[in-house]
């Protein structure tokens, strides 16, 4: 297979399924051959990223992720998509292990703030691990925006939604999701809310009320993935036609 990308997912699996669904649904295709070529690594058994970030005595996910990168190196995709937000804690080491570009989801989401002409405060919602590591905060601040991180009470609600409701129970609790967004917008006085966790992106995909000013990082990553894949396919076709 030529002109393909690879997806490093499985963290979690349902969120990865959501990402793949976005890729397929948003690709303008009228026949099978117009869809995108990709390989999915659904590595569901990677140790919990947040657990390790919060407590270094927990199992380190890094060796598992590096092994995945090494396997993808052998396949030689055009680029790699990392669909777990918290796994971007290890991004620099992963990118250093390959000459294949890895798309940076938090950076793409931060750039979307510029595209949407954001001027106010930006709330960042995600796992406790990604909050502690500053994965999104760093990218957003680098572009000059004021960031707002959830306080303890709000973070506990986010943790409960991500881990208990979605990951453990496979339950998309819309009422709790709206409550979290309402707090971020009204109580924390934020113009935009970044969904910096793929479980929150999964929640947003199926939410019935989407009037909140959300930047869905996974959705943005899906768009950038499609754009890059189509551009590289077009370039390959142009090169082939010149021969």
Curated annotation (Swiss-Prot):
UniProt xrefs under Gene3D superfamilies: 3.40.50.1860
One Pfam family cited in the UniProt record for this chain: Asp_Glu_race
Pathway info: Cell wall biogenesis; peptidoglycan biosynthesis
InterPro entries attached to this UniProt entry: Asp/Glu/hydantoin_racemase (IPR015942), Asp/Glu_race (IPR001920), Asp/Glu_racemase_AS_1 (IPR018187), Asp/Glu_racemase_AS_2 (IPR033134), Asp_race (IPR004380)
Chain ranges passing through the membrane: none
Coiled coil: none
A biological process from GO: cell wall organization
Cystine residue pairs: none
EC number of this enzyme: 5.1.1.13
SUPFAM superfamilies from the UniProt entry: Aspartate/glutamate racemase (SSF53681)
PROSITE patterns xref list: ASP_GLU_RACEMASE_1, ASP_GLU_RACEMASE_2
Keyword Secreted belongs to the record: no
UniProt binding sites for substrate: 48-50, 85-87, 167
GO MF, one annotated term: aspartate racemase activity
Catalytic residues identified in the record: 84, 197
Catalysis: reaction(s): L-aspartate = D-aspartate
Family: Belongs to the aspartate/glutamate racemases family.
Biological role stated in the UniProt entry: Aspartate racemase that provides the D-aspartate required by the D-aspartate ligase to be added onto the lysine residue in the peptidoglycan precursor UDP-MurNAc-pentapeptide.
Quaternary assembly: Homodimer.
Name of the protein: Aspartate racemase
Organism lineage: Bacteria, Bacillati, Bacillota, Bacilli, Lactobacillales
